[in-house]
Amino acid sequence: MNFYNNFFFIALPYVAIIIFVLGTIYRYRETKFKYSSISSQFFETRMLYWGSVPFHYGIIFLFFGHLTAFLIPRYVLLWNQQPLRLAILEITAFVAAILTFLGLINLFYRRLKNPYVRKVTNYADIILEILLLTEIFLGLWVAYSYRWGSTWFAV
């Protein structure tokens, strides 16, 4: 493995987890979880439903899949020894990622096109959604370009 593979696929995930944990502790101790985002769910619900539901179902499935591979990689590798189970896992995870991506696109479109929602939108919301779209797109790209990621992810 070269430096970039070691950095992006070994070191960086651990750095992200450490920052997440320390940031959560800091935020709890210093600000008591004060949220400043304004809710937009009352302005329009139809597009919210078709964006929020697929996004959350997909992201929850992906989160627990990554958590499983992170916590018990040996059992993921044992599961993936049978080609049919490996294919089912890969296809299901890819569909969940597409569901997440399409749901977030719908939410982003709603944020930009609905005048009521746009009124309560600030630049941080837009930047965050662009970053999430980029992250999910890159995950889809890696999953499509480098097959059987659930096996090498757990190694």
Regions found by a protein language model. Name each.
Residues 24-43, 74:
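Membrane-interface helix-loop junction between the first two transmembrane segments
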